[in-house]
Amino acid sequence: PIPDAATLQRFLGPPLAESFMRYCGMTEQEAARATDDYRERYNPVGWKENQVYPHIRALLAALKKRGAYLAVATGKPQQSAETILRYFGLTPYLDAVAGPREQDLHADKGALIRRVLPENARAVMIGDTPGDIQGAQDCGIDSVAALYGYGEKAELLAAGPTHAAEDTAALCALLCPDMEKQKGFFVTLEGVDGCGKST
């Protein structure tokens, strides 16, 4: 049976196979098969249905102009993440991208962050799932809970983020307070994980 909407919402963020096992009671083999079935549609066309939240492109540009090192640590397979970022024109802002290999069923967010985090860097992880916040904590860095993303607000706040942003305007104010406010800015694309985490 197809899970209800609340359960499907929980699929956003963690690796897909992990969600199939956790929320649908599948075995690892069944979850791998279900993930393959999902990718039959997602790989050719589904990924193009992403969107970048308002203000994210301007925020990336402003941070880059200030010399910030910008990276993505995502639960999406690395190749898919790179394709999405390139398609939506976000690659020029980024210094690094880390995601699990296509065949990996589990992704440790802390390990993914460490892959893109320069040694002794002062950094912040922006994420919309408790796993993102936990990954930041595992790496000893600050975090911003993107409350406008796909994660459950209560769960996200319970994870103990350093900061929280209700919307992308609040995220801009937090990360780049002197950034010019955007009026009538584009409404097109989405951050790779649904919340502009590409910052």
Predicted regions: what is each one?
Residues 1-57, 66:
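N-terminal helical cap/lid subdomain that shapes the substrate entry/recognition surface
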Residues 7-8, 58, 97, 126:
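Structured catalytic core of nucleotide-sugar glycosyltransferases
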Residues 18-28, 49, 57, 61-71, ...:
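Substrate-recognition/cap helix-loop segment adjacent to the acidic, metal-dependent catalytic center
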Residues 19, 55, 80-83, 135, ...:
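Phosphate- and divalent-cation-binding pockets in alpha/beta enzyme and binding domains
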Residues 88-98, 155-175:
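Structural recognition of alpha->loop->beta junctions
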Residues 103-109, 154-156, 174-176:
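Short, charged, surface-exposed secondary-structure boundary motifs
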Residues 177-199:
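Glycine-rich phosphate-binding loop of ATP-dependent small-molecule kinases
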